[in-house]
From Swiss-Prot:
The keyword Phosphoprotein applies. This is Ornithine decarboxylase antizyme 2. It comes from the Eukaryota. GO terms for cellular component: cytoplasm; cytosol; nucleus. One of its GO terms (biological process) is positive regulation of intracellular protein transport. GO terms for molecular function: ornithine decarboxylase inhibitor activity. InterPro entries: Acyl_CoA_acyltransferase (IPR016181), ODC_AZ (IPR002993), ODC_AZ_sf (IPR038581). Belongs to the ODC antizyme family.
Length: 189
């Protein structure tokens, strides 16, 4: 189970490597008051942390998948999906891989053009290459577009996750939907 005790939906929103300074002031020290992770030479001595590394997992003419390697083993992996809709338009999805499940956080605001194609490519990749058992999507229940999102994702095959599901955190303010992947059927093809 993923630990999400703060205001974010998934740990994806809390990852220090994805956060940037909130107070940008001109000058050479514009980010001096922001906390920075300690740097450490891999394999070296010291109490610092290794910076996150990103690895290319997959690339074809439309889909690029990269993964932020965690600093410590046992932590969830952050996976980035970029689907090229056109030469100038890209659909991007960020997800967390944990315990044979992929958690995709739906960003606030309107979904970009091409998001459906990007999500379908993500689902296909998750099933065929990552061999996950479930793909979960999550978004805040208070969204104004909640009803259209539920309808859209239900049409794509997602089901609403009931409270208390063992794979999702207890978050009353967050709606979870799941797309179960039956790996037994895909292995027989």
């Amino acid at each position: 189970m993923i630990n999400t005790q703060d205001s974010s939906i998934l740990p994806l929103s809390n990852c220090p490597q994805l956060q940037c300074c909130r107070h940008i002031v001109p000058g050479p020290l514009w980010c001096s008051d922001a906390p920075h992770p300690l740097s450490k030479i891999p394999g070296g001595r010291g109490g610092g942390r290794d910076p996150s590394l990103s690895a290319l997992i997959y690339k074809d003419e439309k889909l690029t998948v990269t993964q932020d390697l965690p600093v410590n083993d046992g932590k969830p992996h952050i996976v980035h999906f970029q689907y090229e809709v056109t030469e100038v338009k890209v659909s991007s999805w960020d997800a967390v891989l944990s315990s044979q499940s992929l958690f995709v956080e739906i960003p606030d605001g309107l979904l970009a053009d091409g998001s459906k194609e990007g999500l379908l490519a993500l689902l296909e990749f998750a099933e065929e290459k990552m061999k996950v058992n479930y793909v979960f999507i999550c978004f805040r229940k208070g969204r104004e577009d909640r009803a259209p999102l539920l309808k859209t994702f239900s049409f794509l095959g997602f089901e609403i996750v009931r409270p208390g599901h063992p794979c999702v955190p207890s978050r009353p303010d967050v709606m979870f939907m799941v797309y179960p992947l039956d790996q037994n059927l895909s292995d027989e093809d």
